[in-house]
Amino acid sequence: MLVFHGGNATTAYNLLACDFLMKDFHIYAVDSIGHPGKSAEVSLSPNNYDYGKWAGEVIEALGYDSICCFGGSFGAGILAKTMCAAPHKVKRAVLYVPSGIKNAPAINSMSMMFPMIMYWITHQDKWLKKCMLPMAVTEKNITEDIYETAKLSINHSKVKTGMPSNVKEKDMRKCEAPTLVMAAEKDCLFPAKGVLPRAERIIKNVKTYLLEGRGHMSSLRDEEKQMIVEFLKG
């Protein structure tokens, strides 16, 4: 299985959240190109299929004709782009709180802009936490490891603000891979009320799941982790 991490993070950190997959799958985890980590420091456009073409090249370089894939947030957007640009290389797919299906209008994230600017100016932790709160919904979802990862990325790398754009229906329908789309009810970036209906419309072989009462940053329950494993095993 190939795993794609979220924006402005690293795959090493992402594996903490994907540890439930390791018992049943051989995991390949790459640092997304242009993001923090060890991949090339080359920024690809999130507005076309460059990320999908890159991921297709990664799958080919690993020696697979096709592979199961899991992606969250920005990484799910990369996976969605891959399903369009290299549809036959994706065997089964899980898109978790995904970008690239039905992104919310940019105005929805404006509440994070002022705290982010204040953090850049003052470097006071309270401002970074206020910036993250719309995504977390409650402070308890801003765990120490999530906070420290975000802080290090912001302090030491050039933050990517543009999310993968919505894929086109005609391109997504080229992919026949069984796909599970999981979207959060209170996600300010990619709300379930937009993501799930469009996923059902544009993805040929899709199953959708609502993460009730949760925002963009939240934890999977044990039964949800098991559902993902069973889906990927087919």
Where in the sequence are the language-model features?
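Acidic catalytic loop of the alpha/beta-hydrolase fold
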Residues: 186-190
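Conserved HGGG/HGGXW glycine-rich cap/lid loop of the alpha/beta-hydrolase fold
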Residues: 1-37
